[in-house]
UniProtKB/Swiss-Prot annotation:
CDD domains documented for this protein: AAK_NAGK-C
One of the GO biological process terms: arginine biosynthetic process via ornithine
Species classification: Bacteria, Pseudomonadati, Pseudomonadota, Alphaproteobacteria, Rhodobacterales
Primary localisation category: cytoplasm
Protein name per its UniProtKB record: Acetylglutamate kinase
Molecular functions (GO terms): acetylglutamate kinase activity; ATP binding
Organism this protein belongs to: Dinoroseobacter shibae (strain DSM 16493 / NCIMB 14021 / DFL 12)
Length: 287
């Protein structure tokens, strides 16, 4: 016996596809840099859903470039190895022992899990870090924090070659120093720097929040750089949202057309943001 979905389901699907058509044209051959992080990384189904979305984006002509984090996995491995961390103003000091673990976890464990998830869904992904082909060269972000880097040079040639070959780059936020040191880079910061170097059409920061909120706690769906600066000065944007919006503003000033902060835990968040009228988070434009 064979059954069919209700007619209302067919109509809803048709409407969704119809709505997506102009956006599919809009993003054909566009480069979209996506920072994958938050709790979605630790959930197998969320990881698989993300991978399917990325593969679909590639199949319809979008060029996704993935940058990932991995803080919880790093914490777990440091605890397992009984390596204690010092903190300065709430930020981890990354000493010589810690940076080895950070690189091992980000490049060797987290990166390959994401690559494998994408390839399992039919995509072609390749994993690399900011060290490969001198992709990201760093200076120390703060000497007191040890091997934590701030990108000063991004060479995107290798990424462009991969994108032209319809391969999905997956990048671990590890950079190299001017003297050959290894640096850990904040994932959002790395994604923003790479997006600017690629002159990406979009930078998507997947987080554990639904977007930038106003003074009443409601998500603001569209903002300008000036709005961000005003809300930050007024204390409306505060705490952990400040570095995320700063990353977006810096990327936009560096040549990215727009940046979006959205909830990576929501199903199909990237697809909803790119291919629907409503979007899925807070989009920031130059103004």
């Amino acid at each position: 016996m064979k059954t069919r979905p209700m007619k209302s389901d067919w109509i809803a699907t048709a409407r969704t596809l119809s709505e997506a058509v102009p956006f599919l044209r809009r993003y054909d051959d566009a480069i979209v840099v996506i920072k994958f992080g938050g709790h979605a990384m630790g959930d197998a189904e969320a990881m698989a859903s993300f991978a399917r979305d990325i593969v679909l984006m590639r199949q319809v002509g979008v060029n996704p470039v993935i940058v990932h984090g991995g803080g919880p996995m790093i914490n777990a491995m440091l605890a397992k190895l009984d390596i204690n961390s010092d903190f300065v103003n709430g930020k981890r000091v990354t000493d010589a022992a810690t940076i080895e673990v950070v690189e091992m976890v980000l490049s060797g464990l987290v990166n390959k899990r994401i690559v494998q998830a994408i390839n399992r869904e039919g995509g072609r992904a390749i994993g690399l870090s900011g060290k490969d082909a001198n992709l990201i060269v760093c200076d120390p972000a703060d000497p007191a924090l040890g091997f934590v880097g701030e990108p000063v040079e991004v060479t995107p040639d290798t990424l462009l070659q991969l994108v032209r070959s319809e391969i999905i780059p997956v990048i671990a936020p590890i950079g190299t120093g001017r003297e050959g040191e290894t640096f850990n880079i904040n994932g959002d910061t790395a994604a923003g720097a790479i997006a600017a170097a690629l002159k990406a059409d979009r930078l998507l920061l997947l987080t554990d929040v639904s977007g930038v909120k106003d003074a009443q706690g409601k998500v603001v769906t569209e903002l300008t750089v000036e709005n961000i600066e005003e809300m930050t000065a007024a204390g409306v944007i505060a705490g952990g949202m400040i570095p995320k919006t700063e990353t977006c503003v810096t990327a936009i000033r560096g040549g990215v057309r727009a940046a979006v902060i959205l909830d990576g835990r929501a199903p199909n968040a990237c697809l909803l943001e790119l291919f629907t009228e409503h979007g899925a988070g807070s989009i920031i434009r130059r103004g």
